[in-house]
Curated annotation (Swiss-Prot):
Gene Ontology CC terms, in alphabetical order: cytoplasm
GO MF terms, alphabetically ordered: acetylglutamate kinase activity; ATP binding
Main function: Catalyzes the ATP-dependent phosphorylation of N-acetyl-L-glutamate.
UniProt xrefs under SUPFAM superfamilies: Carbamate kinase-like
EC code(s) of this entry: 2.7.2.8
GO biological process, alphabetically ordered: arginine biosynthetic process via ornithine; L-arginine biosynthetic process
Name of the gene encoding the protein in the UniProt record: argB
Name of the protein this chain belongs to: Acetylglutamate kinase
Family named by the database record: Belongs to the acetylglutamate kinase family. ArgB subfamily.
Natural source organism: Bordetella bronchiseptica (strain ATCC BAA-588 / NCTC 13252 / RB50)
Length: 300
């Protein structure tokens, strides 16, 4: 892999000073506030973007914000499944998860991916701690049944996929109080201890609601939400989102992302953004500068 230099490294001192000056009012405004970040896409697989993400998260913590990371891991799960001869399948953006797939999901998300993120943040000066839904009873869930579009009276069983029934945020708040950065794997647990695979966008949205987050940022592999002509939509209201769902503009993996974002906006999260995770330092650009890098979701 070619080690592409970080664009920030080639900025002149004057430009860097201007950037810091522009950030100051945002640092004041968001000091002490919780920022939930759904980390996924290319930003998880390209070394240059991994580094910029880790630096962004640590810098946000150092200047007084409280970042909480909820991570995905779809490509890593797909790779692990291929190694055992399985092919991933999806229904309405949700991964069909049989018992064998669930074992892989737990190992990949709660082990490999989570620990890589924790180590990456710690290596650049942060103090990250990994969690799954089982830790502190963080994410309680029940089996999810999907609506069958062909026959709504017959719900679709997609295996060990969960709906969140409760988020108990005490463990996250305790970590924040001790200046740690929580890194959460999207695995929930039922009352009987059954593990459930939960879409990371859904977990991020619910976590933002329960923590009373100031911002929710969903990282993706596109500039934001695009219309059918490929043009970036800078802002979306609830009414516009309904129209985009109806005409098929929003589909596939973007469905749970937009639905969770809208739910968070309706339930008290002040600012919800779909951001381009392929842009280095996209978190700093979205949070600490005048110019955003994606689509803003509003509840009205």
């Amino acid at each position: 892999m070619t080690d592409t230099p970080d664009p920030a490294a080639v900025l002149s001192p004057a430009v860097k000073a201007a950037v810091l000056s522009e950030a100051l009012p945002y640092i004041r405004r968001f000091h002490g506030k919780t920022i939930v970040v759904k980390y996924g896409g290319n930003a998880m697989t390209e070394e240059r973007l991994q580094r910029s993400f880790a630096h962004d998260v640590v810098l946000l913590k150092l200047v007084g914000l409280n970042p909480v990371v909820v991570h995905g891991g779809g490509p890593q799960i797909d790779d692990a499944l291929r190694r055992i001869g399985k092919q991933g399948t999806f229904v309405q953006g949700m991964r069909v998860t049989d018992a064998e797939t669930m074992e892989v999901v737990e190992w990949v998300l709660g082990g490999q991916v989570q620990q890589d993120i924790v180590m990456m943040i710690n290596e650049v000066g942060g103090k990250a701690v990994g969690l799954t839904g089982k830790d502190g009873m963080l994410i309680q869930a029940t089996k999810k049944l999907m609506v069958n579009k062909d026959d709504p009276s017959q719900p679709l069983d997609i295996g060990f996929v969960g709906d969140i029934t409760r988020v108990e945020p005490a463990v996250v708040k305790a970590l924040q109080d001790d200046q740690f950065i929580p890194v959460i794997s999207p695995i929930g647990y039922g009352e009987d201890g059954t593990a459930y695979n939960i879409n990371a966008d859904v977990v991020a949205g619910k976590m933002a609601e329960v923590l009373g987050a100031e911002k929710l940022l969903m990282m993706t592999n596109t500039p934001g939400v695009l219309d059918k002509g490929g043009k970036l939509l800078r802002s979306l209201s609830a009414q516009t989102i309904d129209e985009l769902f109806a005409d098929g503009t929003i589909s596939g993996g973007m469905l749970p992302k937009i639905s969770s974002s809208l739910d968070a906006a309706k339930n008290g999260v002040n600012s919800v953004h779909i951001v381009d995770g392929r842009v280095p330092h996209c978190l700093l650009l979205e949070i600490l500068t005048d110019q955003g890098v994606g689509t803003m979701i509003s509840s009205h």
